[in-house]
Structure formats: structure tokens, C-alpha cells
């Protein structure tokens, strides 16, 4: 059973999601308690590879040191694969959601590429036309 504790909804609006990864999170006891109480903010957070380790930066967890860097737990092969993909221009690794799975706190990371303003406008136009089509279908039936 998965219990979602925090979600970063702005990622889907501002970025094109290429891949998803599930990683464990190294937390202190105080941070675990704060996360379970949903005192977490993922906005502005990102993951970065330093050395051969993956770190979560700029994620606010309400404790004594709210924005400290937290180590992410992934296999070395996955980190190496991610390092190669992050070398491409315009790609970043962002936290999508924080959840509990089998009594362990996990973070879902997304390999993302930023959207341009005209891409966002296209998406809005596409959604509007789909809504109009749905309304027309509902009116016919």
C-alpha cells in the first residue's frame, strides 16, 4: 500500500517528463516524524550527483535544519546511467512525490526537460479543444 505524503504538481506543468525513478531517502528520526506528519515542501527541490552519490537538495522538511542536503539511495548502476542522461543539455532530476511504501519513505524522481513558453501555450490550446469536443459530444447525447 502506498501513502502519498507530498507531491510536486508544478513539475507536470513546467517540464516534460522523460523517465521516472524510485529512490530511498536517508533521513534522521526527527525528519521521519516531520515527513509522516506531511510537513514537507518539494517545490524548488532537485537532485544532483556529487561524486558517485545522489543528493536531494532544496527540499524543505520542517525540522531544526529544514533545507539540508539528503542522500538518495539508488544502485550504483542506476546512478551511473542517470549521470550519463544528465549530461544532455536541458535535463534535470526533480522530485515528483514523497510516499511511504512498505513502511519505508521513498521519493519518486523524474528525469525532466523544461518546457518552452510556446509549448505550454500549445498544451493549453490542445486541452481547450478537447474540452470543446467533449462538451459537443455531451450535448449530442
What are these regions (language model features)?
Residues 50-52, 56-82:
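Helix-adjacent hinge/juxtasegments
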Amino acid at each position: 500500500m502506498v501513502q502519498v505524503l507530498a507531491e510536486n504538481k508544478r513539475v507536470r506543468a513546467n517540464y516534460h517528463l522523460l523517465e521516472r525513478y524510485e529512490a530511498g531517502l536517508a533521513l534522521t528520526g526527527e525528519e521521519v516524524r516531520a515527513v509522516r506528519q506531511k510537513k514537507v515542501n518539494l517545490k524548488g527541490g532537485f537532485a544532483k550527483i556529487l561524486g558517485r552519490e545522489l543528493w536531494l537538495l532544496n527540499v524543505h522538511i520542517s525540522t531544526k535544519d529544514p533545507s539540508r542536503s539528503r542522500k538518495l539511495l539508488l544502485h550504483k548502476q542506476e546512478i551511473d546511467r542517470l549521470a550519463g542522461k544528465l549530461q544532455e543539455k536541458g535535463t534535470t532530476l526533480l522530485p515528483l512525490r514523497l510516499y511511504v511504501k512498505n513502511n519505508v519513505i521513498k521519493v519518486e524522481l523524474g528525469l525532466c526537460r523544461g518546457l518552452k513558453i510556446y509549448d505550454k501555450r500549445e498544451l493549453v490550446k490542445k486541452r481547450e479543444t478537447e474540452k470543446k469536443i467533449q462538451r459537443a459530444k455531451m450535448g449530442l447525447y
